[in-house]
Amino acid sequence: MLTRGIYLLDTDTCIALLKKKPSVIRHLRDVGVHNCKISDVTIAELYFGAVKSGSEKHFNEVNRISSLFESYSILYLLKYAEIRWELEKKGLKIGDMDMFIAATALEEDLIIVTGNTDHFSRIEGLKIENWMER
């Protein structure tokens, strides 16, 4: 069941959308594009993939995704530091980019949409949905 609110699409969800994964497209239609956002961190990760591939098609896809969704360009540095410290105290680790995305979701009260639920579930108070399961 979908939680109603504003959704922050993680990088893997954007990639699934570009690959036209039916469950992601269905959920996006259900909640509406206007209720979905992305982080500039996600855009950076997508551009990294495009640079790595050297494919003009991939650059065009990133441009299309970044123009489709409103993005958050603010990096919540203090929240990132708090998340990182809490995880380190527990002996847990996730990638820096994921912590920046999580910090945005927590500060803006957004629901993260990701297939990477193992990492994100380590962060207390984070609302998570996986649109790739259904």
For each feature predicted by the language model, list its residue ranges.
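PIN-domain endoribonuclease scaffold, especially VapC-family toxins
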Residues: 2-9, 25-111, 127, 133-134
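A generic structural signal for short hydrophobic patches within well-formed alpha-helices
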Residues: 14, 43-46, 120
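Flexible, active-site-adjacent loop/turn segments at secondary-structure boundaries
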Residues: 15-16, 92, 118
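Short gly/ser/thr-rich secondary-structure transition/capping motifs
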Residues: 18-21
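Positions that flank functional sites
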Residues: 102, 119-120
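C-terminal structural segments of small proteins and small subunits
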Residues: 107, 117-119
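Catalytic beta-strand/loop signature of glycosyltransferases that borders the donor
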Residues: 113-115
